[in-house]
């Protein structure tokens, strides 16, 4: 799988289907994807089943004792439980469940923003993303430095 990159706008049709841009379809190279709530609760994440099962979930359920940790159980309920496997149809569309779209303000016949973030695609209501982006006042350099310092320790 190639890294998922780029920013795209796409429209959800009257049946709730979202056409994936061709570059994202090629990078996903899968006939099935997983959609789940974003970690901030204001967008959705889309990833391959392989990445979801073998990387993403492994980070949350890192040990057999993970079920004994209250915070990990809560995270599993909020993120893993609502995850759904979706087929990519012959036209490159996915049908995101209404309940997941409602949770992040994406309606039928509305535009959404798709952002490749490496191993996942974030799906946003454009207005929500604009507000989120405005609230992030740190520069890219400052964010990178902060992450570097945290990883170093």
Language-model features and meaning:
Residues 1-10, 14-15, 23-86, 90-91, ...:
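Flexible "stalk/tail and boundary" regions
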């Amino acid at each position: 799988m190639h890294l998922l990159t780029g920013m795209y706008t796409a429209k959800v049709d009257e049946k709730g289907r979202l056409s994936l841009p061709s570059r994202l379809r090629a990078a996903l190279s899968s006939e099935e994807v997983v959609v789940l709530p974003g970690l901030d609760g204001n967008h959705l994440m889309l990833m391959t089943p392989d990445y979801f099962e073998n990387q993403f979930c492994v980070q949350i359920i890192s040990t057999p004792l993970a079920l004994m940790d209250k915070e990990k159980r809560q995270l599993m309920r909020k993120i893993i439980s609502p995850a759904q496997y979706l087929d990519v149809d012959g036209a490159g569309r996915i049908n995101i469940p209404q309940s997941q779209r409602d949770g992040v303000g994406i309606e039928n016949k509305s535009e959404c923003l798709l952002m490749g973030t490496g191993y996942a695609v974030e799906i946003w209501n454009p207005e929500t993303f604009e507000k989120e982006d405005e609230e992030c006042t740190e520069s890219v350099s400052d964010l990178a430095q902060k992450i570097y310092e945290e990883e170093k320790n």
